[in-house]
Amino acid sequence: NYISILELNNLISGSLVIISVMVLSSLIDLPANLIKIFNIDEKFGFNRMSIKVFILDGVKQLILSILIGLPILLFSLWIIGNLGELWWLWLWVFISFFNFAMLSLYPLYIAPLFNKFEPLSDIKLKAKIEKLLLRCGFKSSGLFVMNGSLRSNHGNAYFTGFGKSKRIVFFDTLLEKLNSKEIEAVLAHELGHFHHEHVKKN
């Protein structure tokens, strides 16, 4: 019983140290984030985020950190304290499995908590993009438009997910500003990451 209590205390104390560092880091970064969004980006016409959205994002991130991050942290500390000299190998296996799982789950369950995603409705643009994807050998489960304008005036496109959840996402601001040729060029840049397997290497 004493050993069990000691192990539990080590897990709790280890978690509290790491959480304290993360909280302190977030508090230090907070003023810089506020200045960047509501001063610099606002000055140059890029910011569309309200204080309400900023606070809601922070609350959602905190809840996700508790629901997902805390169990991962506790289990990682348990591995370090209980699996001997090869703890680093088991920790690597666990973190790798978790990362692959998140690649599949993020676009389906986490990203929609922060943004709305709708299928690309422009039939002509969709046909051109699908033709480009076919040439590059990129298999996607869908083309989606994200309401990036909720937070920023910047335009972007990215691919996310793994396996059946792999998809391509366009910011609505990108579709508003660029023509089809320019959109294909932006997507070609993202496909370059796919071709060189940057996601797998990271």
Language model segments and positions:
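Polar-ligand-bearing catalytic/cofactor-coordination segments
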Residues: N1-N202
